[in-house]
Amino acid sequence: MQRWLSVLVVLVSLCFGWSAPPPQQQAHVFDATVPHRRVHLSYLLFVPASYATTPETRWPLILYLHGGSRRGDDIERVRTLGLPHKLESEPDFPFIVVSPQCPAGEIWTDVEAIDTLLERVMRDYRIDAQRIYITGHSMGGRGALYFAYRLPLRFAAVLVLGTYSPVPAWGGKLAQIPLWLFHGTADAQAPIAEMKELVQAIEAAGGHPRFNILEGRDHFILDVYDQPDIYKWLLEQKRGAAVTDKPPNT
């Protein structure tokens, strides 16, 4: 009996054109020409479930950069960790999210490719250009800081976790952007001392980064992406607004 009910459901679905709704986070391939070369980049694109029913709304966008373990040519691996993994079960997440995949053997340094990808998404979707944010973990955290350093007028805020090899020389430009940095005191892969040097450089340049030191935590602090407060904070940041006084470290 159960078998015949299943068959009936399938037949009715075919007759009436019913089908399962597509996933909100879909894989894409980006091909484009930047000066003197072609770029080929796989990425996941998350669009909130309510996007289609809110035609007057321009949405904030998060650019998510994964860590070194997700490099390669299988975009589905990006879906299994960090913010993309969270999105698999949150169709009403209130941001559009772009999650590119870094090619094998490379790190996040291709500014032209990333900026061109963002331009493409902004062309195709209703994006609030004043509320574009960048985040990442480990190698992706370093990439987020680097892209913010190279493109200081693009991003309204930066949120990074367990950042690998941050560069204090970036402090001057990063001081102009709202920053929230998370780092574990027991991180053996990305020592917290390196992040403290960057924070000092940013503060010396007049910046007010928010720096959360996570006592006893190691490199794997991706559960930070489950904290609602970080998204509330992101939405409070808007490009062109003054960087506010330094909030308390918590």
Model segments located where?
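Active-site machinery of serine-nucleophile hydrolases
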Residues: 61, 65-116
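A domain-start/cap signature at the N-terminus of enzymes
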Residues: 15-61, 135-137, 142, 147, ...
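Gly/Ser-rich "nucleophile elbow"/oxyanion-hole loop immediately N-terminal to the catalytic nucleophile
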Residues: 49-57, 106-139
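Histidine-bearing beta->alpha loop at or near hydrolase active sites
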Residues: 97, 184, 214-221
